Amino acid sequence: MRIKQSEFIISAVKPHQYPIDHRNEVAFVGRSNVGKSSLINSLTNRKKLAKVSGTPGKTRLINFFLINNDFYLVDLPGYGYAKVSKSEKDTWGKTIETYLSHREELKRIVCLVDSRHKPTGDDIMMYEWAKHFGYDVVVVATKSDKLKNAEFKKSEKLIRETLNLTKDDKLYFYSSLNKKGTEELIDKLFLEFATDID
């Protein structure tokens, strides 16, 4: 499929602010600075659709983007940034938890991890939480352009072991810089929710 149209719809904190048109939703979640906004912009081929912040942890809202007038891509606040207060972290955590635990329209969670590093405790907790509640979960390892060819297998092994992924669990490597495999990744993440698959 091709993403022909992508549109920012609303930023939300509370459930009453979420869209009410019952379209399917695919949520992106990951720690601050994992490259979530860059990935969204790359997949949609829109340089400024999701704001890329130079300050980790600045995105505090749930952002809903309508894709091909068909389904929502949902950008969740980044977690794990050390330089914010505990109360702010708690607030972000509750915002994410409220959305993930009560959203019938949510069909898939895309967990982002940094391909260069071992997944953090927060990454593990988020992945296990998503699996526990029965969501279809896809792991995308970002910034793969930073890896040498010989490092891919080592990185994949480390991520799979740390997150306790099975052979059937989905893990994809992606670079927003070189965009290799963009079409394949779009299909893997969104195709089953699309009505226009051209």
Swiss-Prot record:
GTP binds at residues 30-37, 57-61, 75-78, 142-145, 174-176. GO terms for cellular component: cytosol. Signal peptide: none annotated. One of its GO terms (biological process) is division septum assembly. Pfam families: MMR_HSR1. SUPFAM superfamilies: P-loop containing nucleoside triphosphate hydrolases (SSF52540). InterPro entries: G_ENGB_dom (IPR030393), GTP-bd (IPR006073), GTP-bd_ribosome_bio_YsxC (IPR019987), P-loop_NTPase (IPR027417). GO terms for molecular function: GTP binding; metal ion binding. Transmembrane segments: none annotated. Residues 22-195 form the EngB-type G domain. Keywords: Cell cycle, Cell division, GTP-binding, Magnesium, Metal-binding, Nucleotide-binding, Septation. Mg(2+) binds at S37, T59. Its cofactor is Mg(2+). Necessary for normal cell division and for the maintenance of normal septation. Belongs to the TRAFAC class TrmE-Era-EngA-EngB-Septin-like GTPase superfamily. EngB GTPase family. PANTHER family: ENGB-TYPE G DOMAIN-CONTAINING PROTEIN, MSS1/TRME-RELATED GTP-BINDING PROTEIN. This is Probable GTP-binding protein EngB. It comes from Clostridium botulinum (strain Eklund 17B / Type B).
